């Protein structure tokens, strides 16, 4: 009994240490107005769809150059698309990024595209991290932090988080990291 309790405690600590969440940020950076907390019926329907795994939810956000990027345009052109939710201030995101870069380098020629969705609030922090971490794939951010439209649509509660979407629009993987990500991509992109 003590061993089971100990293992559950260790697992909880490990989960806490390996992801960033809204509560991890300073309270003043995480406040929302009543307007921001209100969602329209289309957003509610989309979030319900994501929760039921009925397929991916399309969204459009500004890219690094300020031009709007639509997820469906990227999904339709690739065998597999990984939507990677991250932020420059997130230590676990930075620790995971070499694995994501390796996956991109190993599988991009086989049909993988990655779309980075940053939960940063400052454009300079976001773009400096993209360069520093060698993230050579499309990047998006509305610079709204945890209030990001995409994060809300996909119920992102902690980062790093990811969603794998095949060309048919089906979600075929979630929150895969390191070797698990590499193995799943190898399986899907034979």
Task: Kindly give the residue locations of the regions a language model identified.
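Structural microenvironment flanking redox-active thiols in thiol-disulfide oxidoreductases
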Residues: 95-133, 145-151
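C-terminal motif of bacterial Sec signal peptides marking the signal peptidase cleavage site
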Residues: 17-19
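Short active-site neighborhood of thiol/selenol oxidoreductases, capturing the structured segment around
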Residues: 71-91, 100
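N-terminal "domain-start" segment that seeds a small globular fold
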Residues: 33-76
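Short, internal strand/loop/helix patches
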Residues: 127-168
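Bacterial N-terminal signal peptides that target proteins for export
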Residues: 1-8
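Bacterial lipoprotein signal-peptidase II cleavage site
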Residues: 21-29
């Amino acid at each position: 009994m003590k061993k089971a309790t100990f293992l559950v405690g260790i697992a909880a600590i490990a989960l806490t240490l390996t992801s960033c969440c809204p509560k991890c940020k300073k309270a003043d950076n995480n406040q929302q107005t009543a307007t921001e907390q209100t969602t329209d019926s289309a957003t509610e329907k989309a979030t319900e769809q994501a929760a039921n795994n009925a397929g991916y939810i399309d969204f459009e956000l500004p890219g690094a150059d300020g031009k709007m990027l639509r997820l469906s345009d990227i999904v339709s052109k690739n065998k597999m698309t990984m939507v990677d939710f991250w932020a420059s201030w997130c230590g676990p995101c930075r620790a995971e990024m070499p694995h994501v870069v390796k996956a991109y380098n190993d599988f991009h020629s086989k049909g993988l595209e990655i779309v980075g969705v940053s939960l940063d609030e400052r454009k300079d922090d976001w773009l400096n991290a993209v360069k520093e971490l060698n993230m050579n794939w499309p990047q998006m951010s509305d610079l709204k932090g945890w209030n990001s439209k995409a994060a809300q649509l996909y119920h992102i509660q902690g980062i790093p988080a990811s969603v794998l979407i095949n060309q048919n629009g089906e979600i075929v993987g979630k929150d895969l990291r390191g070797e698990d990500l590499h193995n799943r991509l190898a399986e899907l992109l034979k």
